[in-house]
Amino acid sequence: MEMTQSSNHIVVIKLGGSVLDSKDTSLKDIATLKQLGLKPVLIHGGASTVSAWSAKLGLETRLVNGERVTDDATLDVVAAILAGLVNKEIVAALLDMGIKAAGISGVDSATITGQIRATETGYLGDVVQVNTELITALLDANITPVISPVSFHQTNRPSGSRRLLNINGDPVAGEIASALQAERLVFLTDVPAVKGKNGEALGEISADHAAELLASGTASGGMIPKLRSCLKATLAGSSACIIDGRKPHMLIRELTEGNCGTTVTGQHLRRS
């Protein structure tokens, strides 16, 4: 993998919801990255598991612009599933492969501090600040951090409000990559690549081009927070990519060979 000037070997990886599938190879790839001397930092979501447990508990799932409206009861489920079940399943899988890993949430050591986005979406929040102290301590101890995006509700918290927030894992990944000045930010998702205005798959794009895709509305749905996070990371000197995590060993292929999905660089590329 080609390193940037800082060469700190940190790779921030946003894991898609398929990582617990027995056929998924992402966690095996992470073991290989460790052997190559890289320092993976994992951020995960788990929306489908949250929705499944919400249904079991008789709670309605409501979405606004693709993000979960998080009322008081839903926040309980989000915290229990993301910071608990999903996080520990990933940690256990890594431990089973011989990788030292520790599961944390954004609440631990105030790693991710946030604020409520809007009253109508409840405890759905946005990142205000990232504290890298705990993440760095784990990396220094050769322990792979596995981070749930459940975060600390501190900024502008109304009196009587809860101290937890549900924050989308995509922007959390971008903010953490930026704060760590990571070498790479990688999104493992369920599409082959970012698409251009004519539906064509885009291989390498500049930060400016990514911004144009967002401004024009060409990027839509779940691709919006991913591209925004890629832009955040490139401003800190990282390169970022979005690849299809459904294909075997795409993570290791991207980080050793490249050109597996869409790479966003901070450079200004000449485009036709």
Curated annotation (Swiss-Prot):
GO cellular component, as recorded: cytoplasm
Pathway: Amino-acid biosynthesis; L-arginine biosynthesis; N(2)-acetyl-L-ornithine from L-glutamate: step 2/4
Catalysis performed (reactions): N-acetyl-L-glutamate + ATP = N-acetyl-L-glutamyl 5-phosphate + ADP
GO biological process: arginine biosynthetic process via ornithine; L-arginine biosynthetic process
Superkingdom, natural source: Bacteria
InterPro entries the UniProt entry points to: AceGlu_kinase-like_sf, AcgluKinase_fam, ArgB, Asp/Glu/Uridylate_kinase, Glu/AcGlu_kinase
Residues flagged as site, Transition state stabilizer: 14, 226
Intracellular or extracellular location(s): Cytoplasm
Family: Belongs to the acetylglutamate kinase family. ArgB subfamily.
Protein name: Acetylglutamate kinase
UniProt organism field: Dehalococcoides mccartyi (strain ATCC BAA-2100 / JCM 16839 / KCTC 5957 / BAV1)
